[in-house]
Amino acid sequence: MNFRQRATETVHIVARITGKDYGHVWSMFYYELQTRSGIDLNLMLLRERRTAQFLKKRKSEIRKLTMLYVISNDTYLTMVANKILDTWAMKLLIKI
């Protein structure tokens, strides 16, 4: 399962738990991944689509992207999901 599939699955789970629509939850994930963590999601997805081209042309870049991929693997998706769920739970508690 690649990063996109894991991210999509995680977003669907969070959307079901929170009752929010998929697009809203995905935009929250994208914001967390892109702005707060400094991880460029577009580079992650590009890495998975064009690995062969990078290997031929830019071996140092692929090493950097591979390290980024390993660091931000499932553990990072879980952390982002938990953060979004915590925020959602706090909003519910404030309403009560």
Regions found by a protein language model. Give the residues of each.
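Positively charged, phosphate-engaging catalytic surfaces used for nucleic-acid and nucleotide handling
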Residues: 1-96
